[in-house]
Amino acid sequence: MDLRRFITLKTVVEEGSFLRASQKLCCTQSTVTFHIQQLEQEFSVQLFEKIGRRMCLTREGKKLLPHIYELTRVMDTLREAAKKESDPDGELRVVSGETLLSYRMPQVLQRFRQRAPKVRLSLQSLNCYVIRDALLNDEADVGVFYRVGNDDALNRRELGEQSLVLVASPQIADVDFTEPGRHNACSFIINEPQCVFRQIFESTLRQRRITVENTIELISIESIKRCVAANIGVSYLPRFAVAKELECGELIELPFGEQSQTITAMCAHHAGKAVSPAMHTFIQCVEESFVAG
């Protein structure tokens, strides 16, 4: 059973709404809803009811809450007990997708450096398919990337669903990517063809028979965002990668469907690989950072 679902439930109780819980956990509101629905299915009970503007625990939910607090306390105790007596050392080879490396990994690295200062960390940004193969071929110890399939030989820890968003500058807000059979006289700005969110976007356009003027390939997410802001075209990126630009109005979100499409972020290593103290500490830092946001 996924401990994050219990953390989500605890956060909804503390914050009083799914929206505020999603903001605190740095995930989408749909992810919070999904976690609660999974728990309700698991225990065959309704956990929340809406009273006024607040989400309140049902009677059955109140019965479960003390046990959930106890479970999270026990898990914290287990984590402490699992810590190695000696400080982690040696070399650790980590590979990550660019958006995760740029926007989610700095917090991970900060935690890791504080806990494992003796470890020689090798960190590389790679395509998600290449990361999967590097882990399978023992060319890397740990990968933080988006799930792309064919990973049964990996030990995976899912880090949550990351919502994708279609963005443009306010000056080209009149393009339409929802009406089938339409041609948009703008460019699609993205990175390499094997990019996971590029594949999702282009697949959706094919299904809708929508075309664009051309595709511009750039190697960095920052370059993509700067070109979009300069009215050169649109892009399709993880929401967390453009959150600041959306908040300040430099970019706007374009309609792309009734529900946001998502990709699964995960931390993984080869299932047959012995987990070193450095690997254990790094994975722990990844999980803590993603839960904390």
Curated annotation (Swiss-Prot):
Gene3D superfamilies named in the record: 3.40.190.290, Winged helix-like DNA-binding domain superfamily/Winged helix DNA-binding domain
GO terms of biological process kind: regulation of DNA-templated transcription
Superkingdom of origin organism: Bacteria
Domain HTH lysR-type positions: 1-58
SUPFAM superfamilies hit by this protein: Periplasmic binding protein-like II, Winged helix' DNA-binding domain
Pfam families: HTH_1 (PF00126), LysR_substrate (PF03466)
DNA-binding region: 18-37
Protein name per UniProt: Uncharacterized HTH-type transcriptional regulator YfiE
Organism: Escherichia coli (strain K12)
